[in-house]
A protein has these predicted regions:
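Extended alpha-helical targeting/anchoring segments
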Residues: 1-413
Length: 413
């Protein structure tokens, strides 16, 4: 592992260094992947080039090279994709950049050289250099009428005893100007929001639009699976109020507390399918934490896994994430397919990376998805936003929650 030192600083300083390096890589013609925030014990993980390719879910995050860093995603609906980085740059708490991966230290490895150049540039310019600006997107207003109908349908299903709660999603749409590069726009869109909102975790994957693999720019605050060897945690989010309201309101809300506890039970069930007997535990219940534009209720469930359980097997047992489906899970998934007018795509799936025995995935919420329209050839940008529905939900209240969650994505930074 190689190192290149720089001074330590605030969270904003770390973010600035990471986003400046990401912008430099894109400007130089690379296809980088980035994890910014708290990932794998570092403040940022950057790869200069990751060629994402479609793969079967059973092969996701697998590689014959035990030292490989694998970036990828599993969509809620659609085909999984991943790609291997020959080396990565890791930003530590003390402000030191570390290099890791099979190509580290190889002077003839172009990815290692690209990372060195981008980090040198970032160290020298991050405090003074403005990030590239993304052309403003003209988002539609979302299908409020259909969403509110789905809320009513869900409440009827709850009253009939079919489900206890579900997570209903809606999608917002925009189109990229013909003159814009999709990768450059996505990188600028992502970096500007990471710089402004300082999310705890954010993820960027370069995609391959010509192969039908989307570019993903995610501000998701929700950890799906965090695995270190045989230990795993899942931290579902359920319960939301706008950021301008007192956070303790969440703990006084019967609806939000009930949402969270029901999903915690579902997470315990999911992990219990593959965990060692007796090891599934709720280690944190109903913590109030901030996220861009909102306050959320978080809970954490931990477990111990068998030694030989693969990353793909763990994901399969817990997918789709509990918080974006409902209880009971299978019936909720069936009903959501009927109620939602569009497939979710990457929204509500999983995004992140794996390295050896470590796996870190976020739930792909608060995520912009760049795809190519097969008919017009234009690049579409979509953002899915969802929320938990219980018997205490109202259509108007749920749409207000959608708007609060969507604002950091849809409003110009």
């Amino acid at each position: 592992m190689s190192t290149r030192s720089t001074s330590s600083g605030s969270a904003a300083d770390f973010t600035s260094r990471a986003t400046t390096a990401l912008a430099r890589l894109i400007a130089a013609g690379h296809r980088p992947a980035a994890l910014i925030g708290s990932w794998f014990g570092y403040r940022a993980v950057l790869a200069a080039n990751v060629e994402l390719a479609a793969c079967e879910s059973a092969a996701l995050f697998t590689s014959p090279d035990p030292d490989a860093w694998i970036f990828g995603f599993r969509p809620y609906s659609g085909t999984s994709a991943h790609g291997v980085a020959t080396c990565v740059a890791l930003l530590a708490d003390d402000g030191t950049w570390h290099f890791d991966g099979p190509g580290t230290g190889d002077p003839f490895n172009p990815d290692f050289q690209a990372l060195q150049e981008a980090i040198t540039h970032s160290n020298e310019n991050a405090r003074d250099e403005a990030l590239p600006a993304a052309t403003p997107l003209e988002w539609d207003q979302g299908d409020r009428e259909h969403h509110q109908l789905a809320v009513e349908n869900c409440k009827e299903a709850i009253a009939a005893g079919e489900v206890y709660q579900t997570c209903i999603s809606t999608r917002f749409h925009a189109e990229l100007a013909a003159s814009d590069s999709a990768l450059a726009h996505a990188g600028a869109w992502f970096s500007s929001r990471v710089a402004r909102y300082q999310p705890a975790r954010a993820a960027f994957l370069p995609g391959n639009l010509y192969a039908g693999i989307p570019i993903l720019a995610s501000l998701s605050p929700e950890e799906f699976l965090i695995r270190a060897d045989t230990s795993v945690t899942e931290t579902p989010i359920k319960g939301t109020i706008p950021a301008d309201r007192p956070p303790n309101e969440l703990l006084r809300s019967d609806k939000d507390v009930a949402e969270n506890i029901m999903i915690v039970d579902l997470v315990r069930h999911d992990l219990g399918q593959v965990a060692k007997t007796g090891t599934v535990k709720v280690t944190d219940l109903l913590s109030v934490r901030p996220a861009p534009g909102v306050w959320h209720l978080f809970s954490t469930v931990s477990a111990e896994l068998p030694d030989q359980l693969s990353h793909a097997e763990l994901i399969e047992a817990c997918f789709p994430p509990a918080s974006v489906t409902g209880t009971p899970k299978l019936r909720a998934i069936e009903l959501l397919r009927e109620w939602e007018p569009e497939p979710r795509g990457a929204h509500c799936g999983a995004i992140g990376a794996a390295h050896g025995d470590a796996l870190e995935l976020n739930v792909a919420i608060r995520t912009a998805e760049y795809t190519k329209d097969p008919n017009s050839g234009r690049v579409r940008v979509e953002a899915g936003i969802g929320g938990g529905i219980t018997i205490g939900s109202t259509p108007e209240g749920e749409w207000a929650e959608i708007e609060a969650k969507a604002a950091p994505l849809l409003l110009e930074s």
